Amino acid sequence: MNTSPGAPTGVRAFVDSQPIGRRQRIIVLMVFLIMVADGMDITLASHLFPPVIRDWGVPVSAVTLVVSLGVVAMAIGALVSGPVADRWGRKGVTVVGFVLFCLATAGLGLTGDIHSFAALRIISCFGLGAVMPVALTIVADWMPKARRAQMVSIAFAGVGVGSIIGAYLAAAVIPTLGWQVMVLIAGLAPLIILPFFVALVPEPAIISVRRGIPEARIRSALALVAPDRDIAGVDLTRAGLTLGAGEVRAKALFAEILCRPLLGVTLLIWGVFFVVQGSGLLVLQYMPMLLQAPAPGLSTVESGLIVAMYGWGALIGQLTIAFILKRFDRFIALAAFIFWSVVGLLIVAAFGTGFGFFGYFTLLFAIGLSLPATAAAMQSVTTLAYEEEFRATGMGSAGFAGRLGTLTYGALGGTLIGAGFGITTVSLVLAAPLAVSIGLVFSLRALSRRAGIAPEPHQITPGNEVDDAHVST
C-alpha cells in the first residue's frame, strides 16, 4: 500500500493493511486480563451470597433483589458506555468503569449490612457492565479486518479464565479467611492491570481524529502499532473518516444502529445475545443445584467438579472458536456451536436422570465447549457489524440485551426450580430458544450480506483492504 504524501490513506485502511504486531498483541493481552476480572466476578458472586445470608441473617429474597439490581446495573452500564465511548473516547470510559468496578467490589468487604452492600454492588456492576463492550471495541478498532473476529474472541476468552480462577479463589479463601477477604482480593488485585493498560494501550486513532486530537498524538499512536511503516501519508482529517455507508450523520448514535440497513441486523444481534448470554448464566448459576437434587442426586463435591469441568470446556471452546473464526464463515461457525449446545441439552433432557457422575462430567464438558463459545463469537459478529464511528454504541446495546437475557433467564431458572422441575425439564426449556436462535443467526447472515456489512474475514486479502473498507482516498 502506498503511504506517501501523494496518496493519502484513511486511518481504517492503514490499520487494515498492517499485519498484527507486538503492540497490537499487547492490546489484546491487556483487554484479555480485564475480561479475566469480569469472569472472576461471575463465579465469585455465586459463592458470595450464601455466606452473606448466613452471616447477616438476611432473607433470600433480599439477596435475590441485590442480584437482580446488579444485573440491571450491568445492562445500564453497557447501554450508557457505548455512546459515551463513541463520542469522547474508548480508553477513558474503560479506565473509569474498571476503577468503579474494582473499588466498589473491594468496598463490599467493609460493609456491615445488606443496604450498603447492595449500594456498592450496584456501583460495581455498573462499572463492570460499562467495561466489557468498550474494552472489546478497543481491540476491534486496532485490529486489521482480516483478524478482527479472531482477536476479539481471544480477548473475550479471558472471561473463561476468570471464571476458573474465581472458583478456585472462592474455594481457597472463603472457608479460611471469609468472604470479606475474598472480595478485597477480587477488587484490589485487578487494579494491578490499570497502570499497564494506561501506558500500553493507545486510544484508537479513528476516535482521536473524530475528537480533534492533535495530529502529532495520533501519529504517535499509529507509530506504536506500525513502527516500521511510513505514516506521513495517513489522512488524519475528518475527510479520512468517510467509510461509505458507515459515515456518521448528524443524528443520535443510537439512531445509527437502528436505521436502515442496520435495523434488522441490530435487532437480530440483540435477540441472539439475549438467548446466548441468558442460557449461559442459567447453566452456570443453577447447575450445581440441579445436580444435587434428589434426581440425579450427586454430592456437593461431584457437582463442583462437574461445574469446574464446564469452566475448562468454556475456556477451550472460546479459544478454539477464535481460530475457527479466522478461517471460516463466522455465522456458520456460530450456528454450529449453538447446534452442538442444543444437542447436548437435549441429551440431558432425554436421558438426564439415568446419568451418573461420569456421564454428567462428560456432557457438561461438551456443553461447556460450545455454549460459552457462542458468546465469544457474538462479540466478534457485533464488532464486524458496525463501523468504528458507532461501534461502541452497537457493542453496548448488544451487551444491554445480553444482560437482560441473564436477568430473564435467572428469574426463569428460579421459577422452574421453585416449581419442582428438575434437570431434564430445565435442559429442555433451555434448548428450545437456543434452537430458535440458530434461525436468527442465519437471518443475520443473510441481512449482513444483503447490506454489504463487514465481509467475512477469510475473504479479505492483503490486496483489497482499502476496497473492503470503502475508504475514500
Curated annotation (Swiss-Prot):
GO CC terms, sorted: plasma membrane
UniProt cross-references to Pfam families, sorted A to Z: MFS_1
Membrane topology qualifier: Multi-pass membrane protein
Membrane-spanning residues: 26-46, 60-80, 92-112, 122-142, 154-174, 181-201, 264-284, 305-325, 331-351, 355-375, 399-418, 422-444
Residue intervals annotated with topology Cytoplasmic: 1-25, 81-91, 143-153, 202-263, 326-330, 376-398, 445-473
Compartments it resides in: Cell membrane
Keywords, comma-separated and alphabetical: Cell membrane, Membrane, Transmembrane, Transmembrane helix, Transport
Topology, Extracellular side: 47-59, 113-121, 175-180, 285-304, 352-354, 419-421
Cited InterPro entries: MFS (IPR011701), MFS_dom (IPR020846), MFS_trans_sf (IPR036259), Sugar_transporter_CS (IPR005829)
Domain of life the protein comes from: Bacteria
One annotated GO molecular function: carboxylic acid transmembrane transporter activity
Protein task: Probably involved in the transport of 1-hydroxy-2-naphthoate.
Family that this chain belongs to: Belongs to the major facilitator superfamily. Aromatic acid:H(+) symporter (AAHS) (TC 2.A.1.15) family.
PANTHER family named in the record: CARBOXYLIC ACID TRANSPORTER PROTEIN HOMOLOG
Name recorded for this polypeptide: Probable 1-hydroxy-2-naphthoate transporter
Species in which this protein is naturally found: Nocardioides sp. (strain KP7)
